[in-house]
């Protein structure tokens, strides 16, 4: 087995009780109650068929999750997904995510973890990212289920699957932080360097309240809470940059400087809103990733991913 194949299999490992496979005759996916074996994955990478994997495992854990963002049905003909803008947002907040193109031309935004964690915790963190990126959690977020039950016949449920990238080895490709399309080998190396431990990502919980209140001002204020906590000496300038970048595509538009001053900044100057979390601010204020005190991603069994 070549290294990129082994990395792909590990990075997209999920439920072993079944998977989805596309039937070109019906133009639909069928759920197969069988293990997605190495041969099945190889057939996907060779282009023989297209498969989808269920992130949640039989023990209700998951080692990865994905936000499926595909607004094409709400856009005019000829619409092209703004991948460059999405990547700028991810880069700005240093979010631990990688982006691949979906089958329909939208974005699959993936979080990769060093081992399986409770699915509810993985899903909850992905909702935080969806909230700050898109202002809503009303999107398809995988794992969709946080606990697998049993059907009416007493059989164990298998969960919902999501299409895998790189069908045929060269479609639904991954983009790096600069927006460059990556071949399979490059993508597996890139994603392997972005595998994280869930506990190290706790600071990102500040990006949204537990009830995820929608609206431009709510989203911007909560981003401000995060930025003030982790960049206390420069948070006001960062909030202004956040406003221009993240609210450019918001239905309410970018806040004017006057609006920003009289609402978000005024509130944040008066009070700290991060008492519910106990993570420490970064010791090196010049380093936006200094709060990551755990093992570096490159040290987490990179050869296996």
Regions found by a protein language model. Give the residues of each.
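A short catalytic or substrate-binding loop motif that flags glycine-/basic-rich loops and adjacent residues
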Residues: 47, 59, 158, 217-218
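Modules that initiate DNA replication and primer synthesis
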Residues: 72-76, 84-91, 105-127, 168-172, ...
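Signature for HUH/AEP ssDNA processing cores
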Residues: 1-105, 111-132, 232, 296
């Amino acid at each position: 087995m070549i290294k990129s194949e082994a990395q792909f299999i590990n990075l997209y490992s999920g439920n072993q009780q079944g998977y989805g496979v596309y039937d070109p005759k019906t133009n639909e996916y069928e759920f197969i109650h069988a293990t997605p074996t190495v041969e099945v994955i190889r057939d996907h990478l060779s282009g023989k068929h297209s498969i989808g994997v269920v992130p949640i495992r039989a023990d209700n854990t998951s080692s990865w999750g994905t936000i499926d963002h595909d607004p094409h049905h709400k856009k005019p003909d000829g619409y092209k997904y703004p991948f460059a803008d999405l990547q700028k947002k991810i880069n700005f907040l240093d979010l631990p995510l990688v982006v691949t193109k979906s089958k329909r031309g939208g974005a699959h935004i993936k979080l990769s973890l060093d081992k399986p964690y409770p699915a509810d915790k993985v899903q909850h963190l992905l909702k935080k990212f969806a909230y700050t990126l898109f202002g809503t959690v009303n999107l398809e977020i995988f794992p969709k289920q946080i606990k697998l039950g049993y059907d009416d016949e007493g059989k164990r449920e298998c969960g919902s699957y999501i299409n895998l990238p790189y069908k045929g080895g060269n479609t639904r490709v991954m983009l790096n932080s600069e927006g460059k399309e990556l071949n399979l080998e490059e993508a597996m190396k890139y994603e392997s360097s972005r595998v994280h431990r869930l506990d190290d990502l706790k600071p990102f919980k500040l990006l949204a309240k537990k009830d995820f209140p929608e609206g431009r001002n709510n989203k911007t204020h909560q981003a401000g809470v995060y930025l003030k906590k982790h960049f206390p000496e420069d948070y006001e300038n960062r909030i202004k940059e956040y406003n221009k970048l993240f609210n450019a595509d918001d239905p309410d538009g970018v806040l004017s400087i006057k609006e920003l001053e009289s609402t978000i900044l005024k509130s944040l100057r008066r009070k700290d809103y991060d008492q519910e979390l106990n993570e420490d601010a970064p010791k090196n204020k010049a380093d936006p990733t200094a709060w990551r005190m755990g093992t570096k991603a490159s040290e987490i069994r990179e050869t296996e991913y």
